[in-house]
Swiss-Prot record:
Entry similarity comment: Belongs to the protein kinase superfamily. CAMK Ser/Thr protein kinase family. CaMK subfamily.
All residue ranges annotated as the Doublecortin domain in the record: 159-245, 315-398
Active-site annotation: D600
Protein name: Serine/threonine-protein kinase GG21441
Region: Disordered, residue numbers: 49-73
Residues noted as binding ATP in the record, renumbered to the chain: I485, G486, D487, G488, N489, F490, A491, I492, V493, K508
Broad EC category: transferase
GO terms classed as biological process: intracellular signal transduction
Comp. bias regions, Basic and acidic residues: 57-67
Length: 745
């Protein structure tokens, strides 16, 4: 009796289902058998599909856990083909149902083991020549699962290798990951090392040889060891056994990846904290480093660190580059950031002078004395010759030509103090600007007042053109209005008092109508002040924005501004000036660390707190109307003429250091009572020409009793070249600022 061929799309059945079909076949007619088989098939199809989906999901999850899905799939397909061939050769008159487990598309197929069977895709075929059916299901899923790991198969970890430049004991080296996957050949490693070294140092050619630290030549990647250091040689140079800079930085801090092409770590050092920040000047010892170990706390190391701190201070040195006369002359700012050791100073000099022979190896003073230790750079000499590996002619090299001598004198022009006497009358301070207020308001405003207090408020506001009803309600109800304590181009400042606590504050009213097109300055001032929290910066208590005015409630300082204090006392002592420059330097350092430039530092914007004898106790920086965040060079010409930096006038772009220039002008004024750059009748053009020239003096008799330390600080703050001008941190680190420990804080 022949059976009808049963077709069902995507039908997957097991031996039990086929057995039930066989058992019912003889007792039923062909049509009945077909109906029963269909019923059974329909009842089980949903269950079988769910099982198939679960198997596929389980297999896909294992595929994702494998490191290489493609390679894993190909291996599984190969294994399944072997199993299928094995069943094909051993089974006869049977149906083999196979699922292509290794296939990424998840298709299913049914294959016949013999020519005596009928084969249809996605169809179960029953042999009509025999009364029974032998079904063999070749499903290697269980066997394959055993071979799939439960976690990701680890790949070979890349080696972290540090490479030095052959014969260069100053170069700190670069660290890169090295693996067979990244570098298929040794030549590829040579090319990458050549590129990386060219970005950091000057090399004579391409890298052609790699040595270990003992001088053994490395010929394959397998010879490299993880965490070890090696030496790169260009143009097949012989190995040079020198003391390489192995202690410059930890290996973990010097990793270079393919995407970091500019990771020059030679000067990427953490700047030591200023003595004004770490407690050295207050008698409070800094906290010890975490870990409690004794290795870094030995008396020997502590004494070395103490000596280094006492030796290194910010200063500008003049460098003469070796070569054909007249030789190039340049300047370099040395400070704790780039001069923690003798080798670091040589590295900094190398980057400035750029010798044809590579690194600077020898440095001499102007008199031909060799510089051999760190303290030599911070002694009495400030002009140095820089040499590489070239031969030195001691008889001729240390003689300056006339042109070289003139160039050095031009650089030293700001230090010309000897024999200079002020001719004519004493220079005067610029006039403090006064605001011309608008005309009085209508008399109806005065009649609207309902109390004597309101009458006084209205009278006061009338003189400024502001109506009492314009004040925000929360300010009017919380504070009582006092006298005018300051004014500017767009704003008026009142003293106000809290009604409940009696504390004094300052109310700054900014007239929006007078700064049309410059509203962004107002927004910037509020935005910047909300970010600030420093003891030497005025705090913002409250801000209220209205259509016509912006109202700012600020911290109040009782002594008024520094301009009025200078007018009263004319000049301050070095001790008093030191206090003020410390506080101003600390405020600028805080601002600059946040990438904010003030752009209008002047005595009118510095508020002071005085004692009963008129001595300055505290200084605070105020008025952030021109302050902004620095993301790139700025070009807007702004500020006050007397305090504006030369790069602003030249419109070549400026940054944070314009604040340092302004602070240098203020320090000069504090000590003598007038600015270094003046012009007759306060004319701007001659004044700007003087600022751009950078030439000023310390004339007698006004400077005859002032020490060289503060003159040196001023000279470094008033450098026309921003690259060598002091930073705000350098001001705090200067030996004059640090002096007189106990009494000036």
């Amino acid at each position: 009796m022949e059976f009808d061929e049963i077709k069902k799309h995507s039908l997957n059945c097991n031996a039990d289902v086929l057995s039930s079909l066989q058992a019912s076949a003889p007792a039923s007619s062909p049509h009945t058998v077909t109906l029963k088989v269909n019923a059974v098939a329909e009842a089980t199809i949903t269950e079988k599909r769910n099982q198939q989906q679960n198997v596929q999901k389980d297999f896909d999850s294992h595929n994702r856990d494998c490191d290489s899905p493609v390679s894993s799939t190909s291996e599984l397909e190969k294994e399944f083909d072997d199993l299928r061939n094995l069943h094909t050769s051993s089974l006869t008159n049977s149906v083999v149902l196979g699922k292509s487990i290794g296939s990424l598309n998840g298709d299913y197929s049914v294959t016949s083991a013999s020519s005596r069977t009928k084969t249809l895709e996605n169809v179960v075929t029953i042999d009509s020549a025999s009364g029974s059916t032998c079904l063999a299901i070749a499903s290697p899923v269980d066997h394959i699962k055993k071979r799939i790991p439960n976690s990701r198969t680890p790949t070979r970890k890349a080696l972290r290798i540090k490479f030095y430049r052959n014969g260069d004991r100053f170069y700190p080296g670069i660290t890169i990951p090295v693996s067979n996957e990244r570098y298929r050949s040794f030549e590829r490693l040579y090319e990458d090392l050549t590129r990386l070294l060219e970005e950091n140092v000057k090399i004579p050619g391409a890298v052609r040889t790699i040595y270990n630290m003992c001088g053994k030549k490395i010929t394959s990647l397998d010879e490299l060891e993880d965490g070890q250091s090696y030496v790169c040689s260009c143009n097949n140079e012989n190995f040079k056994k020198v003391e390489y800079n192995t202690g410059s930085q930890p290996l973990s801090n010097l990793t270079l990846t393919n995407n970091s092409r500019s990771n020059n770590q030679r000067l990427a050092k953490c700047r030591p904290a200023s003595p004004l920040k770490n407690g050295l000047l207050t008698g409070i010892s800094p906290l010890p480093a975490s870990g409690g170990g004794t290795g870094n706390g030995s008396p020997l190391i502590a004494s070395r660190l103490s000596d280094r701190v006492s030796v290194v201070h910010p200063r500008i040195v003049t460098l003469i580059r070796s070569g054909t006369k007249p030789r190039r002359i340049m300047r370099l700012l040395l400070n704790k950031r780039n001069s923690p050791s003798f080798d670091h100073v040589l590295t900094a000099i190398t980057q400035v002078v750029r010798l044809d022979t590579g690194y600077v190896r020898k440095v001499f003073t102007l008199s031909g004395i060799s510089v051999v230790q760190l303290s030599d750079f911070f002694g009495s000499d400030d002009v140095f010759f820089a040499y590489g590996t070239e031969r030195i002619n001691y008889a001729e090299d240390f003689k300056l030509e006339a042109e070289e001598y003139r160039a050095i004198n031009v650089i030293r022009k700001t230090m010309r103090t000897a024999g200079t006497t002020c001719k004519g009358p004493k220079p005067k301070m610029p006039i403090k600007s006064k605001k011309v207020y608008p005309p009085l308001v209508d008399s109806e405003v005065l009649k609207a007042a309902t109390s004597p207090e309101d009458d006084s408020h209205a009278t006061l506001l009338t003189s400024t053109g502001i109506e009492i009803n314009e004040l925000p309600l929360n300010i009017r109800n919380t504070y009582t209005l006092g006298r005018i304590i300051g004014d500017g181009n767009f704003a008026i400042v009142f003293k106000i008092k809290h009604r409940q606590t009696g504390d004094s504050y300052a109310l700054k009213i900014i007239d929006k109508n007078k700064c049309k097109g410059k509203e962004h300055y107002i927004d910037a001032e509020v935005r910047v002040m909300k970010k600030l929290n420093h003891p030497h910066i005025i705090s913002l208590i409250l801000s209220v924005d209205q259509n016509t005015n912006m109202y700012l409630v600020l911290e109040y300082v009782s002594g008024g501004d520094l301009f009025d204090a200078i007018t009263q006392v004319t000049r301050f002592s070095e001790s008093q000036s030191r206090i003020m420059i410390r506080h101003l330097g600390a405020a600028m350092t805080y601002l600059h660390s946040m990438g904010i430039v003030h752009r209008d530092i002047k005595p009118e914007n510095l508020l002071v707190k005085l004692d009963e004898h008129g001595n300055v106790l505290e200084l605070k920086l105020a008025d952030f109307g021109l302050a902004c965040e620095v993301n790139d060079l700025l070009y807007a010409v702004c500020g006050t003429p007397t305090y504006v930096a030369p790069e602003i006038l030249l419109e070549v772009g400026y940054g944070l250091k314009i604040d340092v220039w302004a602070a240098g002008i203020i320090l000069y004024i504090l000590l003598c009572g007038f600015p270094p750059f003046v012009a007759p009748d306060n004319q701007q053009e001659p004044l700007f020409d003087a600022i751009i020239s950078g030439i000023y003096e310390f004339p007698d008799p006004y400077w005859s009793d002032i020490g060289d330390g503060v003159r040196d600080l001023i000279a470094n703050m008033l450098q026309s070249d921003p690259d060598v001008r002091f930073t705000s941190e350098d001001i705090l680190d200067h030996y004059w600022t640090i002096g007189n420990k106990g009494n000036d804080l």
